[in-house]
Amino acid sequence: MSNSASSFTGVSSGYTAGTPVPADSPIRDNIADAVRRVRETTPLAQSFTNFVTINLVANAQLAAGGTAAMSFLPDDVIETAKIAGANYINVGTLLPFYKDALPEIAQRLNYLDKPWVLDPVAAGIGRTRTAILQAFKAAPPTMIRANASEVIALANMWGLNTETVGDASEHRPAGVESVDDVESATGAAVALAQYLTEQHAKHSSHDASTRCAVAVSGIADLVTDGETVYRLPGGSAMMTKIIGAGCSLGGVAATYLAVSDPLTAALSASLLYNRAGEVADTTSHGPGSFQVAFLDALWNVTAEQVAESEILVQ
């Protein structure tokens, strides 16, 4: 399965909830620094991503300034992880042997202290995918990037979401599409971010004060480290008309994770996508030209433009 981006970022639709982050906030400095560092150092972010969107994922990572490596064999993933700055696992398209291989890869990444991003595409659909995602609870990622329904489904799957009303099955994605709005996933996103942080603090040799992050894509994206919830209005509705916008965002988030902390990486990737989508909107004439213009915008948008984007604290 593949994220078609119908739940990805879109026009702000007048979304105004939240307090604006000041122009002189250190958060904005961190974002600008992350964008610059990626372009200056071209970090390697390895991706185990789905077959449908692999081309856009790789091209987006390159356009953002990083280096891409696309791996599918478990031994390739482990060997490449040793030299990669960060890694990305997307469960959109799976083969039966991945049921055992992917949890082992996750355990190995954490043993090596290698940060990684999880995109739980279509969480809650299919026994193989469900078994893999359940196993990730014992070897959790550093960051999660997903749509609202996937975030809710994963939190329910891990027994973390106490705010969902009704049967958890009601919140399963319709295929890869979200049937929930971003706002309804706030509690699940916070719970997941807190769990990731707690687990990595126990087992990682990295700074225990570094918090993990969850990014929820939607009309006004949500990013949280489990303590603070940020909303990021903006982007383009045309994102809903190209396959792989959400998947490629996960790959770019991994690129930023190679040079920055999880919260900064999640904010930087989402804001870059919002700004690039807005730029592409002004020159494109349909889905085909939009995708080309979008990749060009990922390349051309400046660090200052990304850092100056609208950021609200919810």
Swiss-Prot record:
Pathway: Cofactor biosynthesis; thiamine diphosphate biosynthesis; 4-methyl-5-(2-phosphoethyl)-thiazole from 5-(2-hydroxyethyl)-4-methylthiazole: step 1/1
Stated role: Catalyzes the phosphorylation of the hydroxyl group of 4-methyl-5-beta-hydroxyethylthiazole (THZ).
Molecular function terms, GO-annotated: ATP binding; hydroxyethylthiazole kinase activity; magnesium ion binding
Annotated binding of substrate, by residue: M70, G244
Protein family (similarity comment): Belongs to the Thz kinase family.
InterPro entries to which the protein is assigned, alphabetical: Hyethyz_kinase (IPR000417), Ribokinase-like (IPR029056)
CDD domains: THZ_kinase (cd01170)
Cofactor(s) needed: Mg(2+)
Protein name (Swiss-Prot/TrEMBL): Hydroxyethylthiazole kinase
Gene Ontology BP, a term: thiamine diphosphate biosynthetic process
Residue ranges of the TM segments: none
EC code: 2.7.1.50
Residue positions binding ATP: R145, S217
Keywords, alphabetical: ATP-binding, Kinase, Magnesium, Metal-binding, Nucleotide-binding, Thiamine biosynthesis, Transferase
Lineage of source species: Bacteria, Bacillati, Actinomycetota, Actinomycetes, Bifidobacteriales
Reactions listed under catalytic activity: 5-(2-hydroxyethyl)-4-methylthiazole + ATP = 4-methyl-5-(2-phosphooxyethyl)-thiazole + ADP + H(+)
